[in-house]
């Protein structure tokens, strides 16, 4: 059974139109400083790899803090398309300059639906459409804002999120157990 819904652009469901991160150098991780989210910290599946966590010492970093319902996208290089939907359980982060932030409007869509949509084959096929041969294409904020997104009804979005969240939460617990066992 095919779901009824509508196609929208990312810009249609966001509060902002895509904001580039802070252009600052990373420094060794210091819990007294703000954690710095870089492209290299984001895995292809949208989870974080903080084994080489860094901080940022720039006083302007406060203006680049991720907030609930924010999603960031990698815009360049072999990581183009990687994305991370901010989860406060991961800690506080300022996002780096090679990331583009969009703030999802919860009045228009279940923001976590967008998190999962941006891990779908539909999303990754859209990203791949910018590739040229073996080179991943760059995607700027304007292009990301035009990204097509299929929106089922809010009820269906909530149902999809409920299922995906239960799987994500289980993976998160398993990863913590694995980290504990390998420590």
Predicted regions and their residues:
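Non-catalytic DNA-recognition/assembly elements of restriction-modification systems
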Residues: 1-20, 146-183
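Sequence-specific dsDNA recognition surfaces
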Residues: 7-26, 35, 40-71, 86
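Short coil/turn segments at secondary-structure boundaries
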Residues: 23-31, 129-131
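A short beta-sheet element
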Residues: 38-39, 59-119
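Short amphipathic beta-strand starts and helix->beta connectors
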Residues: 86-87, 130-133
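A short glycine-rich beta-alpha junction/loop motif
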Residues: 93-99, 112, 132-161
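Well-ordered mid-protein domain cores that form the structural environment of catalytic cofactors
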Residues: 119-128, 148-150
């Amino acid at each position: 059974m095919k779901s009824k819904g509508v196609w929208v652009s990312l810009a249609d469901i966001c509060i902002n139109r895509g904001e580039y991160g802070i252009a600052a150098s990373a420094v060794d991780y210091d819990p007294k400083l703000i954690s710095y989210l870089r492209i290299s910290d984001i895995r292809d599946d949208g989870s974080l790899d903080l084994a080489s966590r860094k901080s940022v010492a720039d006083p302007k970093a406060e203006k680049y803090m991720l907030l609930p319902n924010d999603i960031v996208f990698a815009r360049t290089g072999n990581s183009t398309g990687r994305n991370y939907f901010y989860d406060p359980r991961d800690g506080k982060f300022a996002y780096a300059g090679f990331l583009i932030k969009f703030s999802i409007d919860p009045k228009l869509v279940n923001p976590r639906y967008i998190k999962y949509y941006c891990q779908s084959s539909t999303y990754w096929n859209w990203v791949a459409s910018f590739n040229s041969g073996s080179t991943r294409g760059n995607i700027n904020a304007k292009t990301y804002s035009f990204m097509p997104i299929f929106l089922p009804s809010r009820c269906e979005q909530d149902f999809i999120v409920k299922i995906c969240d239960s799987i994500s939460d289980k993976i998160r617990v398993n990863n913590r157990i694995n980290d504990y066992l390998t420590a």
